């Protein structure tokens, strides 16, 4: 069975259209109208997984549900998993999550694609030079260090304390974890969909989006009601435990580290449904 055709975005890839509608699996209901989305997935079955944030138990449960769901699909096609970034920070088990994703990448039965989130970028920045990003400790970095068995310094501690913590992290973190983080993608395209972590800058072609916007954007994207070259599937911004479903974008981050709910969008030519795990 050949690998599904998911690619990095190229501006020359013209989107196609087909009639489909959004369907929501109970008990979740979408934020916003469940308006019809004229889109296809290129004949593929895709699961787009929202921000995990160190919540290993929910990840394990969701992957089991995805495996069961994919196994019930009669079509002769290899499903694809697209992880939408923010694997680390805030939850208690970032190291376990990264280890699980490394295993899935090497041995899993699905085609797998991993997007970079802003939290992975800050973690990599801390590894490169902790001084400018000591504030990482305030928005989840301390939880990630603890998951690797490291006592985190306070954000305001002297730079020497952060250099020591960084060095301890490099000693304890498996090389495979670092390589995994370094190889994350910024955007993946499939059919009429583009998958990113945070969103895109309105008025800028997908091929010309900046890494900063793909990783960090909120204002100017989530409050903008406009069509893009493709339907944007993203994480990063959440309201509650319900996914966001709009004609121009689908938000799969459901704030698992606070709500306890991890969500995946199931995307195929017939439409979009959702799986969730607590």
Per-range role (PLM):
Residues 2-278:
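Feature recognizes metal-dependent phosphohydrolase scaffolds
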